[in-house]
């Protein structure tokens, strides 16, 4: 069980950028969900923040998050477990995707690169994930079909 946290601020000039301090405070509040490490991503303009607290189960040495695409334009955080990830990983490697980790979460990133939001059709398991796609300027939030790993979100003024 990991903890994930994401914020997308409006492009309004009246809103100040997200600070690393703010993200770290949020992660401290959910640290009990993942005491084995934490990581953050903040977009250059400070309007997107992704945070992750990690409970290491698979890819213990190399599974830090957020994970990013090779071109650093797609960023993802995941709480969950993907079934049959070794087969999917092999298929993605055959298509030319390079893996930086040995964990199962990275398959979701490469499936998103390959299929976009249709990546969910290829994922089996219990999970909640958040993707920031700089190319599309899109924040994508999803969970497993049965809500085993629930996700809570809030929209304000939009």
Residue ranges and their predicted role:
Residues 1-158:
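N-terminus-centric sequence/structural signature that marks the extreme N-terminus
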